[in-house]
């Protein structure tokens, strides 16, 4: 059954257009009613990134939750994984993160976490959807039972200490020069501070949010600024987070980007060496490079694949007992520590491997040669371009041409009106030609 409000990562849309204060109010009321079960006082924690619209959505959510009798703890700008962690730590019934992750500032979103700190299941989200469009006014709290809202103090210190505890107590990064790019987003305070407390020589960029510059030419989706700064200050490593700090990419001392596939290999091999890699394998999506799978097989590590989306990676990890998973885009999930992707924690694990090896990042983190992979996007205004007959024909022809030489993956984004076309194979020219042929037809149909 199609869903009206929830996508693959919560409720998301353009601020004050599809994601309005009224919708946020109703999400708060509906979610509050679903999680208000029992006679005790109910509690929700709300965090956000640095988008201008976060103020509007935060206040609307507070009104929604308190109107149905839930108390609210406001965290302010914090990484998404901090919300999962604090939902559990504060024994809250529900956690909320206001963010559109790596999207531009004029988008925003509402991610919901259960009392266990994990994102809600599809089933619970469907329950909330059904309530959003109902007449909830009949179920509002009595005047004496309206909830209260307050700001929680010391949030950043709590999260920093949590992140540091994922390392051995004697682990330091003395003598390592780190450039950290916080995307002008949720990690702009905690990431530089955590690295400094661990002894690193820290140079920070993307730490001056103004409400509209989140992810703009900085962060994990725009690594050029980080690469340039690493070379400029002769740093040992660069770390780039995205807007809500749940994903990370690394830049080596030469300014070369290390993506999530390479980072998963680094962490999985380190965990295996220490005897703590569950099931001797990891979970990644269909987007991860075939080179990763081949490399891991040579290291005695299996790779299980899922649909695209960190929630599906995590579901597979929880169902089958894996403790390492992630996406090529930099969502790295280490379930021994976190209930979601955590850019800072993943970066600390990689830094620990670098410190232990005592070698340049270019040697430590480039674990395999990826197969040529071409990824292109087509934006569309409406309709279902993939159901067009001309598109079906060109896709079938592309799959035939790549049959014995690689693979083709075409999928609509779960968070925006975009179709992603990915081709991969041993012959780069063939892959590029195949992808371009599909893109040409899609663009004509989508126009």
UniProtKB/Swiss-Prot annotation:
Q: Kindly list the positions annotated as binding Mg(2+).
A: 101, 242, 244, 246
* Positions bearing Phosphoserine: 101
Instruction: Report the PTM annotation.
Output: Activated by phosphorylation.
| A GO term, aspect molecular function | phosphoglucosamine mutase activity
Q: Which key words tag this protein in UniProt?
A: Isomerase, Magnesium, Metal-binding, Phosphoprotein
Q: How is the cofactor bound?
A: Binds 1 Mg(2+) ion per subunit.
Active-site residues annotated for this sequence: 101 (phosphoserine intermediate)
Tell me which CDD domains the record gives.
Answer: GlmM
Q: What does this protein do?
A: Catalyzes the conversion of glucosamine-6-phosphate to glucosamine-1-phosphate.
Q: Which family does it belong to?
A: Belongs to the phosphohexose mutase family.
HAMAP family from the UniProt entry: GlmM_B
Q: Would you tell me the protein name for this molecule? A: Phosphoglucosamine mutase
